[in-house]
C-alpha cells in the first residue's frame, strides 16, 4: 500500500517533516483535551514548534491521532502525547498507535516503556492496562495534580 493510501487509512507510521502541520494540530487538541491539567505541560510550546523533532520518534495515524517516544535512559523510553481525535475513539486507533510504538521501542533495544497519565483519562488508563502496563513509582517530575505512573516491560 502506498504512503498516500496509508495516510488516508490512518495506519500508524513514522512522522516526517511533511506531517508537521497535522502533528501541531493534534498536539494542540491534546493539550486542550486536558483542560486545566494542560497548563502543567512544561515545554509544550517548544515541543509543538519542533515537530516532528524534539522526540526520538513520533508516529501519526493519518489525521486521526499520534503518539511520541522519548528516551529516558539507555534501556527505558517514555510514551508521550498519545492522542486520538474524538471521532476516531473506540475504533482501535489508539491501540494501533501504542502497539506500533511498542514495536519501535523493542526494535530500538528498550526493555521498559514508561508513561504518565491522569485519573481523568479513564479510557486511556483502561487501554494501557489492557496492553500490560502496570502502576509504577514516579519516574519524572510531572507537576500535574494526581498524575499516575505506569510501565510496561518490553
Functional labels for PLM-detected ranges:
Residues 91, 95, 99:
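Residues forming the Rossmann-fold NAD(P)(H) cofactor-binding site
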Residues 42, 114-122, 129-150:
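Conserved catalytic-core motifs of GNAT/GCN5-like acyltransferases
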Residues 2, 148-154:
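Terminal substrate-recognition subdomain of acyl/acetyltransferases
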Residues 85-91, 119-120:
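Active-site acidic-Proline motif in GNAT/NAT acetyltransferases
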Residues 97, 121-124:
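Conserved short alpha-helix immediately C-terminal to the canonical SAM/SAH-binding motif I
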Residues 105-117:
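Conserved GNAT acetyl-CoA-binding A-motif
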Residues 1-7:
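Actinobacteria-biased recognition of intrinsically disordered, low-complexity terminal regions
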Residues 8-10, 14-80, 85-86, 98-100, ...:
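Acetyl-CoA-dependent GNAT
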Amino acid at each position: 500500500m502506498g504512503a498516500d493510501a496509508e495516510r488516508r487509512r490512518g495506519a500508524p507510521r513514522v512522522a516526517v517533516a511533511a506531517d508537521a502541520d497535522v502533528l501541531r494540530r493534534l498536539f494542540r487538541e491534546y493539550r486542550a483535551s486536558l483542560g486545566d491539567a494542560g497548563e502543567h505541560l512544561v515545554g509544550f510550546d517548544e515541543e509543538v514548534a519542533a515537530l516532528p523533532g524534539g522526540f526520538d520518534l513520533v508516529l501519526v495515524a493519518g489525521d486521526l491521532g499520534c503518539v511520541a517516544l522519548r528516551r529516558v535512559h539507555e534501556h527505558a523510553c517514555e510514551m508521550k502525547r498519545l492522542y486520538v481525535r474524538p471521532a476516531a475513539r473506540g475504533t482501535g486507533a489508539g491501540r494501533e498507535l501504542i502497539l506500533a510504538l511498542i514495536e519501535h521501542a523493542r526494535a530500538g533495544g528498550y526493555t521498559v516503556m514508561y508513561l504518565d497519565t491522569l485519573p481523568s483519562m479513564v479510557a486511556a488508563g483502561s487501554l494501557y492496562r489492557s496492553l500490560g502496563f502496570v502502576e509504577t513509582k514516579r519516574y519524572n517530575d510531572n507537576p500535574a495534580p494526581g498524575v499516575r505512573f505506569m510501565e510496561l516491560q518490553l
